[in-house]
């Protein structure tokens, strides 16, 4: 696959510009070319994000870098090939070599990515962030780094520790700090202030609603495997209707453009 570096750089710049504190970039995560097309045709869609959990599940693997990096990159490539929007990829913890993984993701058409710390020492993960930044510069693009601290997801939900980690990652070259699990108004507001608005969160039925997160100044909101959950629930309900000898659902006729 030949990469148009100029077009890729423009997409990277557009992705970065879409991170707006108070008017957040909303990402409905995709896991294959089909789901990416469905999301891309939705009004207001500015970018496509992948979800590692969903891609792994679709390939029969558990989450957590159990899917080989080559298969993950191929899934990213297939997604980027069918949409004209910027693609930001969930690169888990970088597969042991964040620089090489980011370089491969860029070759696959991604212009941004998540890198999670899994509670590694902040200085260690900052090295991965710096390697990702260097990989983007070597490719001639501003690779948009969404650096994740797992303090709320896997740790003790310590606000000060999350802030310290996030600031370390920003200093290392991250563009936004992803804090999954941070859910109270007070904590979200504190994180927004600490990161000068460069806060990324994951939304769910249990989180604060989108409009409140926007009012608090969040810059980016994704749904992770939640979009796969929506699709699976629709398939489950349709299957139950058919297997009970019910009517053929009208939604069976839907096809995304180009599919």
Q: Where are the regions that the model predicts?
A:
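Active-site-adjacent C-terminal substructures of enzyme catalytic domains
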Residues: 244
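A short, charged, Gly/Pro-tolerant segment at domain boundaries
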Residues: 249-259
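Ligand-binding clefts/hinges and TM-proximal coupling segments of bilobed small-molecule sensing domains
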Residues: 234-235, 239-241, 258-259
């Amino acid at each position: 696959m030949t990469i148009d570096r100029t077009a890729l750089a423009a997409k990277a710049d557009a992705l970065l510009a879409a991170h707006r504190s108070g008017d957040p970039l909303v990402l409905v995560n995709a896991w294959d070319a089909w789901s990416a097309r469905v999301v891309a045709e939705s009004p207001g869609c500015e970018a496509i994000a992948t979800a590692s959990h969903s891609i792994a599940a679709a390939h029969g693997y558990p989450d957590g870098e159990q899917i080989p990096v080559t298969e993950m990159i191929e899934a990213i490539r297939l997604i980027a090939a069918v949409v004209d929007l910027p693609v930001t990829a969930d690169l888990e913890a970088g597969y042991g070599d964040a620089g090489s993984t980011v370089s491969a993701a860029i070759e696959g058409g991604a212009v941004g990515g998540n890198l999670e710390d899994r509670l590694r020492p902040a200085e260690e993960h900052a090295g991965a962030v710096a390697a990702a930044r260097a990989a983007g510069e070597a490719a001639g693009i501003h690779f948009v780094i969404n650096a994740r601290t797992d303090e709320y997801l896997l740790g003790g939900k310590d606000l000060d520790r999350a802030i310290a980690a996030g600031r370390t990652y920003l200093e290392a070259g991250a563009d936004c700090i992803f804090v999954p699990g941070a859910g109270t108004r007070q904590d979200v507001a504190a994180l927004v202030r600490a990161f000068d608005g460069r806060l990324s969160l994951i939304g769910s039925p249990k989180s604060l609603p989108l409009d409140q997160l926007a009012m608090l100044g969040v810059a980016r909101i994704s749904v992770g495997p939640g979009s796969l959950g929506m699709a699976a629930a629709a398939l489950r309900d349709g299957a139950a209707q058919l297997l009970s000898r019910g009517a053929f659902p009208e939604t069976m006729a839907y096809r995304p453009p180009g599919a």
